[in-house]
């Protein structure tokens, strides 16, 4: 490919809506162009990277015996209603109606479609296990698309699904996917973590995420340097001890707290620490209102609450709903005299004489106690674990970091097969629901994550495995006939050897060419410039300042040898260490 022909419109200036390095460089480097918020066109360079990522993923899927299919993006609501997720999935699901007023969705995932497919085809345990996958577009109506490809409304994903006759079979396939995903990460060359994760709207009883550490990552990771425990903050368990207060219970008292709503305001106004206040948070779910209770100095983990109640539709009640149904502003809600289900974190078990909302505007109760003043229906761990909390395995203080999720795998069990009546006949002639797993990989976000991982102040630093082109040949002076002739010879010779090479034959300054080459991130640059008069050309790794001079007076053999050595040594991790 010649730069004169390559459709890669680079930008000197950074677009105003850019928030991340990957978003900036992919736009400026001519890899993507924005169509609307969270929707992008992939230009030739971006498409080449995507195809290479897809090929790596396909190779690893095929290696473990998964078979590729392609399912429709447009999915009928009937299947989602059958699984119970039409309402549970939330506002991120893109819904639409056809001309006959029938409901459809642009698929964010394909559990319903694939389960319906298999239930009509597989009848016997002898046909199991089955593993299928696809690489296709997915859709999420993000409330605020941001970070370029990292939180988009349309994105490319590999999703795989497995069907089994036993849990042991699912466990074996689950481990195969863990190994396959680890190999994908190794081939990308990035640092990564495999963490325990919450199952969320997908469901199931076990889940792991594969994340790339990054400052702008949206996955909060807790990890233990001693025992190796790793989990998302949604999943991380708190197993520390809570103090049991020995003080005597005091009489309950309602006190005026005019205009005091937040934990901080209540703490200052009443002169009590936040740990002596109980937060009361009202949620609306499938079965109505639920009140979650937790100590005032801790943060409630909504994912844990949803998991405990097995209700992914759960959401915080709005101030308008609370005022309408309880007759009190939201800042004064409390558990006393409230006839709703109450789920409490273990942190309040040992509390005595604490503060709660007064269920009346501008009032709070002091010296509240349970079970004297209110009943807790269910106890569970609702606390968001933070850095410094004890590791649930060994007790050492946990460390925290952020990461970009690329892969997510789930043991679904029989959630979908039972809901959709997908059964097979086992070896005893009994009808049993399929035991399922599902396994996602974000293809388009992988491109952004790699850029976040490998870049410098000049642009992207692609690993060889997914670089759009491996080599760029820069003719530094297009008016020099010798440079032009030799540059063309090198370009044609590399093409004949099967190298993915670009020839920069534009009539622009060397500095302009170098800046574009660095911005785009070609792994290896070959300079054909003034040193050619001495029979010498230069090779340079994208992340290195060192120029390797190679004599070509006796032909191009020495160039090919130097290039092969440089490719063998090429490791963009050197740029970030």
From Swiss-Prot:
Keywords: Aminoacyl-tRNA synthetase, ATP-binding, Cytoplasm, Ligase, Nucleotide-binding, Protein biosynthesis
Highest taxon of source: Bacteria
Annotated GO CC locations: cytosol
Keyword Magnesium attached: no
Catalytic function, reaction form: tRNA(Pro) + L-proline + ATP = L-prolyl-tRNA(Pro) + AMP + diphosphate
CDD domains to which the protein is assigned, alphabetical: ProRS-INS, ProRS_anticodon_short, ProRS_core_prok
Primary residence: cytoplasm
Gene3D superfamilies in alphabetical order: Anticodon-binding domain, Bira Bifunctional Protein, Domain 2, YbaK/aminoacyl-tRNA synthetase-associated domain
Subcellular location: Cytoplasm
GO BP terms, alphabetized: prolyl-tRNA aminoacylation
InterPro entries: aa-tRNA-synt_IIb, aa-tRNA-synth_II, aa-tRNA-synth_II/BPL/LPL, Anticodon-bd, Anticodon-bd_dom_sf, Pro-tRNA-ligase_IIa, Pro-tRNA-synth_IIa_bac-type, Pro-tRNA-Synthase_IIa_type1
Protein purpose: Catalyzes the attachment of proline to tRNA(Pro) in a two-step reaction: proline is first activated by ATP to form Pro-AMP and then transferred to the acceptor end of tRNA(Pro). As ProRS can inadvertently accommodate and process non-cognate amino acids such as alanine and cysteine, to avoid such errors it has two additional distinct editing activities against alanine. One activity is designated as 'pretransfer' editing and involves the tRNA(Pro)-independent hydrolysis of activated Ala-AMP.
HAMAP family registered for this protein in UniProt: Pro_tRNA_synth_type1 (MF_01569)
The family this protein is said to belong to: Belongs to the class-II aminoacyl-tRNA synthetase family. ProS type 1 subfamily.
Subunit structure: Homodimer.
Domain notes: Consists of three domains: the N-terminal catalytic domain, the editing domain and the C-terminal anticodon-binding domain.
Alphabetical list of NCBIfam families matching this protein: PRK09194.1 (NF006625), proS_fam_II (TIGR00409)
Protein name: Proline--tRNA ligase
Native organism: Thermotoga neapolitana (strain ATCC 49049 / DSM 4359 / NBRC 107923 / NS-E)
